[in-house]
């Protein structure tokens, strides 16, 4: 019986004696389980599922569970490598004392079982306790009524238990792979084996500089939001690769340069730190690069999602400037004439009046749209032979009658034949003439007129709004030409947007039960659609606000959750980096003390090393964030939020708060390093 429990006791004893190493790892595992359970539970929550906007949030949270699962696998593998490295000498001693590789494998198996049981049990217990708090926070972000029913998601419990069972099994198999084929002597000497600096430092450093410069140039040169969306992930990959190259090879190059500077290098506070850094920078640089990337991810996520959440009402108002928006479209023979538009207007107002409301702040206009590829000031409508790269350049062209634009905006603009006004959205139009498919050319009298908000802001593609006289005549000419040239038929649309004095729950179909104006208008327009052969749509700001809040609130909540995970991951990496380097430097500082180096000199040397490398990730993350700002701004435009001042504010506050947290971590981990290299050496 004692033999059966021997391996379990050895595993537990080894973990307990190395608690300085294992405790952060166990906490990290439990934290990952906790976060995964909460996100999985919320993504399938019945409470959120029955709320307006809850569906959008659920989709976002499901994506978050995938991110957590993948990150947990990578991060736990990374941190476990520190544990194995520190335990290799212990395993070598077991081997020398008569234990075979199979016996050591049993110890590792029991360590895995104990780790899985402790962390999964603790994480799930905390998850069940804190789940309701997270759900209440999510409900609060969605701005919907709160429910206090306590629920336990059995499916989420099983999913978390299964996922982390697989992760710990893979970690165990990797540990056994590392153990297999290594001799006892190699295990005993593992802690004294130095890390060789990477070869061809100058080549790798130059590659990192080129990659980073290319990513930065890409970030500041892209003008269209859709192009920013498509190129964003390519830029992210380039920045990640460049960061690793610069921290691994660039750090070695920096250390070699400092060693050549005799006035700097041959000082007590610099000599030990620089010489030790030069021979361990491959692993040290990778850790610092990981911290830099995690810090950048946190800053980008929290600044952008905070900006979205704070500015969500601005986004709603930009997309829906009025309470209701009615659209009638689909006539290919001719746009609605004034008499037909008046008939529709009276029908809509009569429906609103019969429902008990009144219309105000009315905006009504007609428009017709085409799309094509810009070639200077010419928009080419025939896209045959266009490449995949051209998809980001496709531009929507909306033509509006001058009289409708004036009525909708309250202006009194005038135009002569052949003249137009242009408003550019999500693109630039610096030209004095506008040509449509090489045939119709207009002189642009003003390129900066205020665009009509509403449906135009919903397009994610570059858009030009063109205001022109003699609208009906031009549309007929355009349709005749396009029909003959491409076989196309145009779609004309009539918009009627207005405010109403009805309460929000009677404006749109919010809860699916209350009679509302949106359903009444759809009923009236269904008859119009049948009689006239046109398409119709009715959109309510009140009903769509819930979807906006669901999407933006979900992104904000996910940004907070992932930021917490990434911050703790960065802290764990920094802690293990300082811990492992502290143990490796302990003997070096012990020798330096014996030849006359004082505790004050040791402290100065430690501060020199920490200040040299510890703040590099934060500084470079700040630089990454500055160059990512144009990308972030353009991506937020795709969410109908174009508020540069708000984004600057949230970005600055996010960086300031993160910098304070980073400084606190620097202080704590620096003290850990100092205690290992200074106080432990004194005991000898």
Predicted features by range, described:
Residues 114-258:
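Hydrophobic alpha-helical segments
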Residues 41-54, 124-156, 213-230, 617-680:
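Short helix-loop junctions at transmembrane helix boundaries
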